[in-house]
């Protein structure tokens, strides 16, 4: 049959060829659209059958054994921004650990202190002011928390009333665990008291047994004769809840042999050198706090 145009007149050869190409193009486009819809439907069915079931946030972090990006990974050192803030949002909140530390105020008065893992500095500042220390250095691995602590100190100094003494408080960003044990050889005594409150778990999970043992030895070396290490270790039960923060932390957790109930024996051993340990007290916290023993280790 001859091809005709809209006026039912026969088409010329070129016109017929052009029309045929146009029809072929339209048919091809229609076929592609149909094929595209079919593929999308198949993909949708595959996705529906392969999608994992609903899971808790903790389980979603490790689908197929691989850690997913999660905001908790930013806090793998325990550097929670509101670690103390959650406890002081209520102005009536009182950190009961201050009462335990206050049973021996002479340990702090006119002394030079180091607070390892000071977070945003709330407790450090309260200790410095309440017990009239000579100076206090707060150290934390999170630069943002240190910036917050420095701002708090600056605010206190600006708003201090005449005659209101503000102790010399300095906050420093850094990792207390050294890159190499050989650096311990250059340590010199410079503090009367070192505070390590609820920090051992995070050192342990990130730097293994060797990192925590090195930190203990460094604490001893930085204390003057007769100096005190005030230690508030976390129990090993609390480690398990954080082991999924990253694959490295999980591997470190599985490799731990040096348990918290071994800390005292190690600190009193010749490898470290502390002369004695005494229990300072166990805080009786409200439910938003902690109830961990606070120990005092004395350097002979």
From Swiss-Prot:
Span list, region Disordered: 1-21, 34-68
Key word S-adenosyl-L-methionine present: yes
Organism: Drosophila melanogaster (Fruit fly)
Gene from which this protein is expressed: Amus
Impact noted for substituting residue 84 to A: Able to rescue early lethality phenotype but not sterility phenotype of mutant flies
Knockout or disruption consequences: Embryonic or larval lethal. Conditional knockdown in ovary leads to female sterility, possibly caused by dysregulation of miRNAs and mRNAsso.
GO biological process terms held by the UniProt record: snRNA methylation; snRNA modification
PANTHER family in the cross-refs: 7SK SNRNA METHYLPHOSPHATE CAPPING ENZYME, BICOID-INTERACTING PROTEIN RELATED
Highest taxon of the lineage: Eukaryota
Gene Ontology MF terms: O-methyltransferase activity; RNA methyltransferase activity; snRNA binding; U6 snRNA binding
Stated name of the protein: U6 snRNA methylphosphate capping enzyme Amus
Keyword field: Methyltransferase, Nucleus, S-adenosyl-L-methionine, Transferase
Bin3-type SAM domain mapped to chain residues: 95-300
Similarity annotation: Belongs to the methyltransferase superfamily.
UniProt biased composition (Polar residues): 1-12
Primary localization: nucleus
Residue numbers binding S-adenosyl-L-methionine: 119, 140
Enzyme Commission numbers on file: 2.1.1.-
């Amino acid at each position: 049959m001859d091809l005709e145009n809209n006026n039912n007149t026969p088409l010329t050869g070129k016109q017929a060829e052009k029309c045929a190409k146009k029809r072929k193009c339209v048919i091809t486009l229609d076929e592609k659209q149909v094929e595209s819809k079919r593929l999308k439907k198949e993909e949708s069915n595959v996705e529906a059958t392969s999608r994992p079931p609903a899971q808790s946030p903790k389980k979603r972090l490790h689908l197929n054994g691989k850690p997913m990006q999660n905001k908790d990974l930013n806090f793998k050192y325990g550097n929670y921004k509101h670690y103390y803030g959650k406890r002081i949002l209520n102005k009536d909140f009182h950190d009961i650990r201050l009462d335990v530390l206050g049973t021996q105020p002479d340990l702090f008065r006119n002394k030079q202190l180091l607070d390892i893992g000071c977070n945003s500095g709330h407790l450090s500042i309260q200790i410095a002011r309440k017990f009239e220390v000579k100076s206090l250095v707060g150290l934390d691995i999170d630069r943002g928390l240190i910036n917050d602590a420095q701002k708090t100190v600056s605010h206190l100094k600006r708003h201090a009333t005449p005659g209101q003494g503000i102790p010399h408080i300095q906050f420093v960003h850094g990792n207390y665990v050294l890159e190499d044990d050989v650096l311990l050889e250059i340590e010199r005594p410079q503090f009367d008291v070192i505070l390590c409150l609820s920090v051992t778990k995070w050192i342990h999970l990130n730097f293994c047994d060797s990192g925590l043992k090195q930190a203990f030895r460094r604490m001893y070396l930085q204390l003057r004769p007769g100096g005190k290490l005030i230690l508030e270790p976390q129990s090993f039960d609390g480690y398990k809840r954080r082991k999924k923060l990253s694959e490295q932390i999980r591997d470190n957790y599985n490799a731990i042999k040096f348990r918290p109930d071994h800390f005292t024996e190690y600190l009193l051993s010749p490898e470290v050198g502390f002369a004695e340990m005494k229990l300072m007290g166990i805080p009786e916290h409200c439910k938003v706090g902690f109830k961990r023993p606070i120990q005092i280790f004395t350097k002979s």
